């Protein structure tokens, strides 16, 4: 399944505020607020990519090559709202038919979430991705370990603004991040 985020970007202050990060960094001035905000964006993106999750609530669409039972590769999925399909040549996905909710089943409890189909109609045979699954995904309440991982990443990037630090003992940040984030990772194998 190919996924496209369709909703507007989440306000990152709903995930973690710059004030929270400044308190963690023990920064009391405002001169570096822009830098800390940029580091926050990078840290949130890294956590989302590493865990295959979304922080904040997003609306999205998943595209399938047919009515195949499928996993949804990002999460946590909070609801699958509708399934539409292509019956004619339409490269803009503007004129899709809606599949009745009785013809598909979803499981949003397990992660990755799944969708299964039954009694489905014929789709346009020359369409590459004729089935469109609309859903919402994302953590609306941020888990404490995820917030701590974001704080660690921001602190690491704030203190180490270059790729390599010479003359210091090597320390491993990744283990701490893995310990915090592994319970939230969604492993998707197509």
Q: Which stretches of residues belong to each language-model region?
A:
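Divalent metal-cofactor coordination and adjacent catalytic microenvironments
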Residues: 1-190
